[in-house]
Each structure stands twice: as structure tokens, then as C-alpha cells.
A protein has these predicted regions:
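Structural scaffold elements adjacent to functional motifs in cytosolic proteins
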Residues: 44-46
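Rhodanese-like catalytic fold shared by cysteine-dependent sulfurtransferases
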Residues: 2-5, 16-36, 42, 51-84, ...
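Short, surface-exposed ligand- or partner-binding patches at beta-edge/loop junctions that are enriched
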Residues: 88
């Protein structure tokens, strides 16, 4: 029994110590995202490819492809650390990666839950 208990303790201590530090970002619904981006101090970031962005995007957003090897460097030279970032991708997978990278670098990040697909499904404004 003591071995079992020790094993459980070891498992949980390992689990909690392996969590990455510094990844603090918030998932927000399309409605919350719309409220956030109504604030002119919020930076709008589309992390999809240039082709996807060119097809259609949320008005006022800038595009930095998270799959670009230089994503972090481009973001640092383009974005302001003292202003929060509201970011999105197509469905949420790439934006999670971008949110993790940016939050580790000290940015305050909000990620659009369900991405651009969720945004469009709720009838929110887009531009081409």
C-alpha cells in the first residue's frame, strides 16, 4: 500500500512539475472577442497563412503566419508588449501555438475560441 501511495504521489508531483510555465492566455467566445477588439488598445492578430488572410479576415487584424520559422521575431518587431493581443486562426489549433509562444514572451493574449470558423458562424463582421 505504501508503494502504491508513493507511486501516486510521484505521478502527481511529476505531472505538476512538467507543466510549462509562462503560458497564460485566455480563451474567449466570439461575443467576448468582439467586445475586446472594440477597444482600440487591443492588437488584432490573424495567425493563418497569407493566402487564408487574403481570402477573408476580421477587420483591422494584421497577419503574421505562426507557421513561419520567424514568427516570434516578426511578432516582436511588429507587436507592442504593453497592449493586449486578440488572436485567431481558422479553427483554434494554430492560435493555441501562437498564444503559447506570445504569452511566454510576456504578451497578454486572448485567443478566439473556435477561431475564424466560430466567428463567421455567429455572423460577425469580416472583410475581404
Amino acid at each position: 500500500m505504501k508503494v502504491f501511495f508513493a507511486g501516486i504521489c510521484l505521478f502527481f508531483s511529476t505531472l505538476f512539475s512538467c507543466q510549462q510555465k509562462g503560458e497564460h492566455f485566455e480563451y474567449v467566445s466570439p461575443g467576448e472577442f468582439a467586445t475586446l477588439i472594440a477597444d482600440s488598445d487591443i492588437q488584432r492578430l490573424d495567425v493563418r497563412t497569407v493566402a487564408e488572410y487574403s481570402e477573408e479576415h476580421i477587420p483591422g487584424s494584421i497577419n503574421i503566419n505562426v507557421l513561419d520559422e520567424q514568427f516570434a521575431a516578426i511578432a516582436d518587431s511588429t507587436l507592442q508588449k504593453d497592449k493586449p493581443i486578440a488572436l485567431y486562426c481558422r479553427s483554434g489549433k494554430r492560435s493555441k501555438k501562437a498564444a503559447a509562444i506570445l504569452s511566454r514572451k510576456g504578451y497578454k493574449v486572448y485567443e478566439l475560441d473556435k477561431g475564424f470558423i466560430g466567428w463567421k458562424e455567429t455572423g460577425k463582421e469580416t472583410e475581404k
